[in-house]
A protein has these predicted regions:
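C-terminal regions of RecA-like/P-loop NTPase motor modules
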Residues: 2-10, 191-227
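Glycine-rich P-loop/Walker A and Walker A-like loops and their local beta1-loop-alpha1 context
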Residues: 13-67
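Conserved inter-motif catalytic segment of the P-loop NTP-binding fold
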Residues: 58-121
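Short, structured coil segments at secondary-structure junctions
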Residues: 78, 143, 166-168
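Substrate-engagement module of ASCE P-loop NTPases
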Residues: 122-123, 128-154
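Phosphate-binding/switch region of NTP-binding enzymes
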Residues: 152-207
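Conserved mixed alpha/beta core segments that line enzyme active sites in large multi-domain catalysts
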Residues: 154, 270-272, 276-317, 373-771, ...
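A conserved helix-loop-beta module that forms one wall/lid of the active-site cleft
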Residues: 283-344, 350, 356-359, 363-372, ...
Length: 858
C-alpha cells in the first residue's frame, strides 16, 4: 500500500531505536509496517529491543501481540501492553481479535508481533499467513500505527513472499555473520537515498554501510539462495509421503497430524478418522486438495461412511464389489478466505459479523462473493482438476466447517451446483468458477443466515470448503443420470403402520438424479421405502399407485449443457443399459383399455413403482447393511445420500454421496392417551402418519389456513399468505402453537400448499398437513428431504391428516366456531383474515403413542 493511497499523511516520525539507521532511512513514518526476514529469532529480538526501548522513552503506547507458545520476544514487559492470543481458534477469530485490539488502542500506539512463521506453523498454511498480513497491515497503516513483524527466511513460497512484499511498506533482511548483525533493506516505500538499499552493519547505535564489492560478495556468499521454495503445507505433505515406508508409530504420529490439518483438532469426528483412516488414506485425501485448509463436514462425512462400510469386519467382504469408488477433489477453506481477502471483501465481512450488520450487509457481501476473481495460482489448479475429469459431469458442493456435523445438519442451506462440463476448456473453467462463487455466495442467503442465528452459530467461524464429485451415472442418449438415487435414514421416525420396525431405517427413492429426493418437488412424489418390508406402501400411495408415483426425472442434458427435468417416458425410452423393468412398467390398466378400443399404446405412461427392484434384488438388503454399520460406528442415527447404477444382469454398484448424523430427539416416555367418548370429542385423531415420538404437548394457539378460501386466491396472493404466516410465526415465538393447513407446507408450487420457507414456520411446536382430496391438496410424506430434516432438527412435531380414511377424524367445525384473533396478535401488518385464522386454544393438548401409532388432539 502506498502513502498516496491514504487520504491523510502523518508527519511525526517514529524512531527504530538505532540512530544510524534512522539517519539513513529517515526513521519510520506512522503507519509503516516493517517486516524482518530472519534466520534466527534472536536477530529479530535485537531490532525489537531497540524499537521498544526507544518507543517507551518517547512515551509511545507499546503493544505486544503474543501468540508464540514459548517465551516472549520482549524481555521487560513492565511498560508494554501484552495481548496473548490463541492461533488454534483459526484465522477469522484470531484476525478479528487483533483488529479489535488495534481499534481500542490510542493513536500514539506502536505494535510488535511475534514471528509470522508461528502463524504459518500453527495453520499449516503459507496462504493464510499472507491473508492475515494483507488484512492487518492496511488497517495499521490506515490508523497511522507503526508495527514490527518477522518471517523466517526461505520458509515461504515465492508467491507468499510476493504478497507480503506487495502489502508492507518496509521489507528488511537481517543477518548474523560471524557475530555481527547486518541489515539489508529490500523495500522502503516513499523514501530514497543513494545508499539506502546497500547492506548495513549495526554497531550498537551506529551503522556502517557496506559499499565495497569485495565485502558485499563475502557477506552474501554465506546465504542459501534456493531456487525452489516449498510452502509449509507441502513440506508436511512430503514428510507424510515419506513416512509411508517408516515404522508404525511414526505413521500414526504423521497421520494424526494430517487429520488435524484437514479435519480439525476439535472435530468430534477426529477420533473416528484416527480409527478408520490409514496414513495412506490421509495422504490420498491431501493429494486431492486444492489450496490448503480444512476439507469441511460434507467431505469428511462422505469419506467416513465409505471407509466404515469398506473396512468394517461385518461389511467389507459383502461390499467389496458393490461399493462404487469415488475420486473426489476438495477445495480447502483457505481458498475461501483468500478469495475474500483478494477481492477486498474482508472489511465488509467484518461488518457483516456484527450484531447490527448481520442481515444489513449480507446482500452486499453476497453480491461481492458472487462476482469475485480467483488468483492465477488457484485457477491453474482448477484447470488441472477439470483436465482430470475431462468432460464427465461433476457437482460442486458446499462443505463448510460446521456442515453435516453433530448437532448441525445445514440441510439444503448452502448451494450445490452441477457442472455438465461441456464446451471449450475456458467455458468449462468459467462454469466451474461460477459454481464455486455460487456456493460461496450461498453462505449469505437468508435461510443460511437464519439457521446460524437460530442455533447460536452466527458468531462461529464458518469456513467454506468445496467438495467436487464426479456425478454418479452414465450417458443415455443426450442425458446423463444415475439409475436411482435418494436419501436413506437409519432410523425411520415417520411410520404409517404399527408393524413398521423403526430401527430398520427408510429410503426416499427416485429414478434419475437425487435432487428430487432431497427437495419437496412439485406435482410429483417419491417412493418411500420402509426397509423392514420394502414393498409396504404408504396409505395414499396404496390407494392410487400411479397418481402418487414419480412422474418427472431430473437429468443432465449434455446438448443443452444444463440440468433439466423431463417426463419419465422420455427418460426410459433410450437404452438404459439395464432392465427397465427393475424400476417400473407401463400402466397396465391404461394399456388394456387402449388395446380394447384400438388406441396406440406406445405413449402409455411408464409407472415408476420400483416393485422388481425392491422384491427381486439385494439392493434394500445392501442399504440396510450400510445404515446399520454406519449408524453403529457413529453411535448415532445417520442420514445418507446415495446413488446406484445397474448393469445388464441387474448387478448394482452403490455410491455413498453424503453422510451426516441425523439430528433426532428421543422417542420419549410412553404417554397415556386420553379416552375419547366419541369421535366428535376431539379436534383430530389419526392412526399413523406422524413424526416426533411420544409426546404430550400443550397447544395454546392454532394458526389455521382455510382451504376453501386459499384455493380461490390468485397465485401471487398465495405467496403473500406464506409471507403473512412468517409474520405470525415471529410473533408466536416461544409460545405453544400449531400450524395447520392444506396440502404440502413448504411446496414451491402454491397450488399444492402454502409456499412458506422453513424460517416462516420455525417457531411452531407442531406442523399439521391436511388432505383435501376434492381440491387435489395432499400432504407429502417427505421424510428425508431437506425440509423434513429441518423439522426433525428443530424438534417440530409433524402430523398428516388424510380425509376419507376410517382411522382419521378431523372436526374442523370445532375451530371455525372459535373467534379469529389474528388481528389482535398482528396489529400493524396487513393480514388476510379470510384465509389465515389464529385461534386461542389454551387447554388443548396433542398426545401421541409410537407403540399404538395413535395421535390425538383434544
Amino acid at each position: 500500500m502506498k502513502y498516496s493511497d491514504r487520504g491523510d499523511v502523518f508527519m511525526d516520525k517514529i524512531s527504530t531505536g538505532i540512530k544510524g539507521f534512522d539517519d539513513i532511512m529517515g526513521g519510520l513514518y506512522p503507519g509503516d509496517n516493517v517486516v524482518w526476514q530472519v534466520e534466527d529469532i534472536n536477530n529479530y529480538k535485537h531490532v525489537v529491543d531497540a524499537f521498544v526501548r526507544k518507543s517507551i522513552k518517547d512515551e509511545k503506547n507499546v503493544n505486544y501481540i503474543h501468540f508464540r507458545k514459548v517465551n516472549s520476544i520482549i524481555d521487560d514487559l513492565s511498560k508494554v501492553n501484552l495481548f496473548e492470543l490463541d492461533l488454534a481458534k483459526g484465522f477469522e477469530d484470531f484476525t478479528m481479535s487483533v483488529h479489535n485490539i488495534i481499534k481500542t488502542q490510542s493513536e500514539n500506539a506502536v505494535y510488535v508481533f511475534d514471528s509470522l512463521t508461528y502463524i504459518q506453523r500453527g495453520w499449516y498454511s503459507d496462504l493464510m499467513t499472507a491473508n492475515f498480513f494483507k488484512v492487518t497491515c492496511p488497517y495499521l497503516y490506515k490508523i497511522g500505527a507503526a508495527a514490527y513483524f518477522s518471517i523466517k527466511r526461505n520458509s515461504y513460497t515465492y508467491d507468499t513472499i510476493a504478497k507480503i512484499r506487495e502489502t508492507t511498506q518496509i521489507l528488511m533482511d537481517i543477518y548474523n555473520v560471524d557475530g555481527s548483525i547486518y541489515i539489508h533493506p529490500l523495500k522502503v516505500e516513499n523514501r530514497y537515498t543513494p545508499i539506502l538499499f546497500f547492506p548495513h552493519k549495526i554497531e550498537e547505535d551506529k551503522i556502517t554501510t557496506i559499499t565495497s564489492s569485495g565485502e558485499a560478495s563475502k557477506l552474501f556468499s554465506h546465504f542459501d539462495w534456493r531456487n525452489k521454495r516449498l510452502g509449509y503445507w507441502r513440506i508436511n505433505f512430503n514428510k507424510a509421503k515419506a513416512a509411508l515406508t517408516q515404522d508404525e508409530s511414526t505413521q500414526e504420529r504423521i497421520k494424526q497430524n494430517l487429520i488435524d490439518i484437514l479435519v480439525g483438532k476439535d472435530s468430534k469426528i477426529n477420533e473416528m478418522c484416527k480409527q478408520y483412516f490409514t496414513l495412506a488414506d490421509m495422504v490420498q485425501i491431501a493429494s486431492r486438495e486444492i489450496g490448503t485448509g480444512f476439507i469441511g463436514g460434507k467431505s469428511i462425512g462422505m469419506l467416513m461412511a465409505t471407509a466404515i462400510v469398506s473396512k468394517s469386519e461385518e461389511t467389507k467382504e459383502y461390499f467389496k464389489d458393490i461399493l462404487e469408488p469415488h475420486d473426489s477433489f476438495y477445495v480447502g477453506t483457505d481458498v475461501f478466505y483468500s478469495y475474500i481477502v483478494e477481492n477486498g471483501l474482508w472489511d465488509l465481512r467484518m461488518k457483516q459479523k456484527t450484531d447490527e450488520g448481520y442481515f444489513k450487509y449480507a446482500k452486499e457481501l453476497q453480491d461481492g462473493l458472487q462476482n469475485g476473481k480467483f488468483s492465477e495460482m488457484i485457477e491453474e489448479q482448477f484447470m488441472h482438476l477439470l483436465e482430470y475429469y475431462g468432460q464427465c459431469p461433476i457437482i460442486v458442493r458446499s462443505s463448510s466447517l460446521l456442515e453435516d456435523n453433530f448437532g448441525n445438519a445445514f440441510a439444503g442451506k448452502y448451494d450445490s451446483v452441477f457442472c455438465i462440463n461441456q464446451g471449450t476448456p475456458s467455458q468449462r473453467l468459467k462454469a466451474f468458477e461460477d459454481a464455486i462463487r455460487t456456493v460461496y455466495a450461498s453462505t449469505m442467503n437468508e435461510d443460511a443466515l437464519n439457521y446460524r442465528k437460530n442455533r447460536g452459530l452466527d458468531k462461529r467461524d464458518e469456513q467454506m470448503a468445496i467438495l467436487v464429485q464426479r456425478v454418479s451415472g452414465d450417458y443415455y442418449g443426450e442425458y446423463y443420470f444415475p439409475h436411482i438415487a435418494g436419501v436413506a435414514n437409519s432410523s425411520n421416525l415417520y411410520v404409517w403402520n404399527k408393524k413398521i420396525d423403526m430401527d430398520a431405517g427408510m429410503l426416499r427413492l427416485v429414478f434419475g438424479l437425487g435432487t428430487r429426493a432431497v427437495d419437496r418437488v412439485n406435482n410429483d412424489y417419491v417412493r418411500i421405502v420402509a426397509l423392514d418390508d420394502p414393498t409396504r406402501l404408504p396409505a395414499m400411495t396404496k390407494k392410487d399407485p400411479q397418481r402418487f408415483s414419480q412422474h418427472y426425472v431430473d437429468v443432465l442434458n449434455l446438448n443443452k449443457n444444463e440440468l433439466e427435468t423431463i417426463i419419465v417416458n422420455e427418460a426410459v425410452k433410450s437404452n438404459l443399459k439395464t432392465q427397465s423393468s427393475l424400476f417400473g412398467s407401463k400402466d397396465k390398466e391404461t394399456e388394456e383399455r387402449f388395446k380394447r378400443v384400438g388406441i396406440d399404446t406406445s405413449n402409455i405412461p411408464f409407472v415408476l413403482n420400483f416393485e422388481r427392484l425392491l422384491r427381486s434384488t439385494k439392493f434394500t438388503e445392501a442399504m440396510r447393511k450400510i445404515l446399520k454399520v454406519v449408524s453403529s460406528k457413529y453411535n448415532y442415527p445417520v442420514d445418507i445420500e446415495y446413488t446406484a447404477n445397474f448393469d445388464k444382469q441387474g448387478n448394482f454398484r452403490i455410491n455413498i454421496v453424503q453422510c451426516r448424523p441425523l439430528q433426532t430427539r428421543g422417542l420419549g416416555k410412553t404417554v397415556e392417551l386420553p379416552k375419547l367418548e366419541d369421535k366428535n370429542s376431539c379436534l383430530f385423531s389419526s392412526t399413523g402418519n406422524f413424526m416426533g415420538g411420544n409426546v404430550r404437548l400443550a397447544i395454546d394457539y392454532i394458526v389455521f389456513i382455510s382451504s376453501d378460501d386459499y384455493v380461490k386466491l390468485p397465485e401471487v396472493e398465495k405467496y403473500n399468505i406464506a409471507r403473512q404466516v412468517g409474520i405470525i410465526n415471529k410473533e408466536l415465538k416461544g409460545k405453544n402453537a400449531m400450524l395447520m393447513g392444506p396440502g404440502r407446507w413448504g411446496s414451491s408450487n402454491p397450488e399444492l400448499g402454502v409456499p412458506v420457507k422453513f424460517t416462516e414456520l420455525c417457531n411452531m411446536s407442531v406442523m399439521c398437513e391436511i388432505a383435501y382430496s376434492n381440491q387435489d391438496l395432499m400432504p407429502e410424506l417427505s421424510y428425508g428431504s431437506h425440509f423434513f430434516q429441518d423439522l426433525v432438527e428443530t424438534g417440530i412435531f409433524y402430523v398428516a391428516l388424510f380425509d376419507n380414511k376410517e382411522d382419521v377424524v378431523f372436526n374442523e367445525n370445532k375451530l371455525r366456531k372459535k373467534e379469529n384473533i389474528v388481528k389482535q396478535i398482528i396489529k400493524d401488518a396487513n393480514i388476510n383474515d379470510e384465509v389465515i385464522k389464529v385461534y386461542d386454544t389454551k387447554g388443548l393438548q396433542i398426545y401421541s403413542d409410537i407403540t399404538q401409532q395413535i395421535v390425538t388432539c383434544s
